[in-house]
């Protein structure tokens, strides 16, 4: 009887430990999520019109719903991380932790087609060269959010002289 109680107690402790540890095992960091959703170093979509359909599924962006828009960056992770060392700009959400690349980068823009309907998500694949903007956080400071891509780099708005007062 004592052995049976010991085994049951051990199993209970094991189950409690697994329940305690399990949520932290399944939690994807923001940096890891950025890499999964946006990084495809050393690859290109130019010869594959089904690139977005394949990658969106492979990278788990069609589970439960079709993600409407996503961008993959075809540069090294180090080159994308280096964007975080540029001068900061304001993100689309108003936060000041966005940074724009100094040069254009090879990207693939994936956009849901009009015929796309979950679970049969369908995407249009467009290969482009654009300046990318990423939000960065953490220590080390790394990309955690893809904020956009533009053809021309952001330019600072020149300051205007103070208005003249009429006397």
Curated annotation (Swiss-Prot):
It comes from the Eukaryota. InterPro entries: RNaseA, RNaseA-like_dom_sf, RNaseA_AS, RNaseA_domain. GO terms for cellular component: extracellular region. Its EC number is 3.1.27.-. GO terms for biological process: defense response to Gram-positive bacterium. Pfam families: RnaseA (PF00074). Residues 1-26 form the signal peptide. One of its GO terms (molecular function) is RNA nuclease activity. Gene3D superfamilies: Ribonuclease A-like domain. The active site is at 38 (proton acceptor), 145 (proton donor). Glycans are attached at residues 88, 155, 159. Keywords: Disulfide bond, Endonuclease, Glycoprotein, Hydrolase, Nuclease, Secreted, Signal. Belongs to the pancreatic ribonuclease family. This is Brain ribonuclease. The lineage of its organism: Eukaryota, Metazoa, Chordata, Craniata, Vertebrata. The gene is BRN.
């Amino acid at each position: 009887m004592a052995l049976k109680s010991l085994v049951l107690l051990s199993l209970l402790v094991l189950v409690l430990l697994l329940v305690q540890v399990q949520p932290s095992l399944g939690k994807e960091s923001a940096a890891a999520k950025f890499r999964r959703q946006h990084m495809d170093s050393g690859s290109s979509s130019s010869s594959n019109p089904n690139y977005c359909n394949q990658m969106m599924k492979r990278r788990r962006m069609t589970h439960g719903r079709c993600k409407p828009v996503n961008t993959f960056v075809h540069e090294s992770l180090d080159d994308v991380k280096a964007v975080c060392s540029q001068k900061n700009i304001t993100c689309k959400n108003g936060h000041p932790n966005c940074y724009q690349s100094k040069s254009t980068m090879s990207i693939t823009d994936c956009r849901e087609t009009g015929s796309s309907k979950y679970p049969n998500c369908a995407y249009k694949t467009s290969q482009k060269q654009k300046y990318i903007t990423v939000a960065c956080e953490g220590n080390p400071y790394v990309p955690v959010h893809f904020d956009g891509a533009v053809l021309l780099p952001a330019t600072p708005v020149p300051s205007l002289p103070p208005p003249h007062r009429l006397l």
